[in-house]
């Protein structure tokens, strides 16, 4: 396996939403905020946060429950509430200023992304070519690079 990057569960909202409702300062602030939640993954419905004293899991009640992460992202972009998705899913929206990541200092550890293949002494040339192509592409992808805390 070759590590090519990492992703993070992130909480984000539109700048207009944050201006109207305020930027959460503590993970517990999400419990009283409007939430847009995707039912697509349990990783995104139970919100794990890291605190100095240890990890906590929040189960916010959604204002809007949607069936896909893309729908949650679109609703958050339109100001419906905070949502939690994976960092690569919102990287372009964050870069464009359409969404802001909040509570970054409380994020759980990043999840590594690997290219996995059967590593034998005789790897077929087609497989090796594809693996090399994939590794090069994924290692260049900004959305899979670690983010500096407080950078987004």
Name every feature range the model reports, one short phrase each.
Residues 34-53:
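Secondary-structure junction motif
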Residues 87-96, 106-152:
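C-terminal effector-binding regulatory domain of bacterial HTH transcription factors
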Residues 37, 58-68, 106:
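Short beta-strand-to-loop elements that line the ligand-binding cleft
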Residues 1-38:
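Flexible hinge/capping segments at coil-to-helix
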Residues 15-16, 70, 88-89:
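Alpha-helix/helix-capping structural signal
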Residues 73-98:
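A ligand-binding cleft/hinge motif common to bilobed small-molecule-binding domains
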Residues 2, 28, 73-74, 128:
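Alpha-helical segments flanking ligand/cofactor-binding loops in enzyme cores
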